[in-house]
Swiss-Prot record:
It comes from Cupriavidus metallidurans (strain ATCC 43123 / DSM 2839 / NBRC 102507 / CH34) (Ralstonia metallidurans). Belongs to the purine/pyrimidine phosphoribosyltransferase family. PyrE subfamily. Homodimer. It catalyses: orotidine 5'-phosphate + diphosphate = orotate + 5-phospho-alpha-D-ribose 1-diphosphate. This is Orotate phosphoribosyltransferase. InterPro entries: OPRT (IPR023031), Or_phspho_trans_dom (IPR004467), PRibTrfase_dom (IPR000836), PRTase-like (IPR029057). Pathway: Pyrimidine metabolism; UMP biosynthesis via de novo pathway; UMP from orotate: step 1/2. Catalyzes the transfer of a ribosyl phosphate group from 5-phosphoribose 1-diphosphate to orotate, leading to the formation of orotidine monophosphate (OMP). Keywords: Glycosyltransferase, Magnesium, Pyrimidine biosynthesis, Transferase. GO terms for biological process: 'de novo' pyrimidine nucleobase biosynthetic process; 'de novo' UMP biosynthetic process; pyrimidine ribonucleoside biosynthetic process.
Length: 225
């Protein structure tokens, strides 16, 4: 009998996939906020066709399992464009055919013009991106969606770092994800979270990941929500 995939199984499978792809790596990295992070997630490395197809499956399954109602996908420029379009293809393969749209950084004054490309933004819209750092692209997306007369339904991301906003020394009280949820009253859905990553490291039998587990746990202790 086939075992049904649970959300936890999905997140652990995604973490393994991201590690194998080199998208998720361990070491010493400096974030934009100036913090020394023991891990790094770079969705820009989902740059092969088969790899993008796989990550789109994770996005699509996570979205469907969330139970969120949606009519259109929106991908903020630039990483969100590829992620939203690939997720739309994956959803169609699962029997859910929806439109997708994205924005340009600069408006066109010829052709179709404007800043929006793709399906008309209408009904309930899910914003798809890789992560939420400062929340800037989400806020810009909210403005575009509402200006089009549509309703933001959720934000779907690959990884929730579960990390307080601020800098290395000036640590905030909430994460960017929490701020988005509170400000707009919509859910932020993640394929995997920092908690899932720690669970993966706890369960791993790879001795080389032992130090990484300690470093990630210490980082969460200092900056985590």
């Amino acid at each position: 009998m086939t075992q049904q995939t649970t959300p936890d199984d999905l997140s652990q499978s995604f973490i393994r996939f991201a590690l194998d792809a080199g998208v998720l790596s361990f070491g010493e990295f400096v974030t934009k906020a100036g913090r020394k992070s023991p891990y790094f997630f770079n969705a820009g490395l989902f740059n092969q066709g088969a790899m993008l197809g796989q990550v789109a499956q994770f996005y699509a399954k996570t979205l469907l399992e969330s139970g969120v109602q949606f009519d259109v996908l929106f991908g903020p420029a630039y990483k969100g464009i590829t992620l939203a379009s690939a997720t739309a293809v994956a959803l169609a393969g699962m029997g859910r055919d929806v439109g997708f749209s994205y924005n340009r950084k600069e408006a066109k004054d010829h052709g179709e013009g404007g800043t929006l490309v793709g399906a008309k933004l209408q009904g309930k819209v899910v914003i798809i991106d890789d992560v939420i750092s400062a929340g800037t692209s989400v806020r810009e997306s909210m403005q575009l969606i509402r200006a089009a007369g549509a309703e933001p339904a959720a934000v779907l991301i690959a990884l929730d770092r579960m990390e307080k906003s601020g800098t290395a020394d000036n640590i905030g009280t909430h994460s960017a994800v929490q701020d988005v949820q509170r400000e707009y009253g919509i859910p932020v859905i993640a394929i995997a979270t920092l908690k899932d990553l720690l669970a993966y490291l706890d369960a791993s039998k790879d001795p080389s990941l032992g130090n990484s587990r300690e470093a990630v746990a210490a980082y969460r202790q200092k900056y985590g929500v």
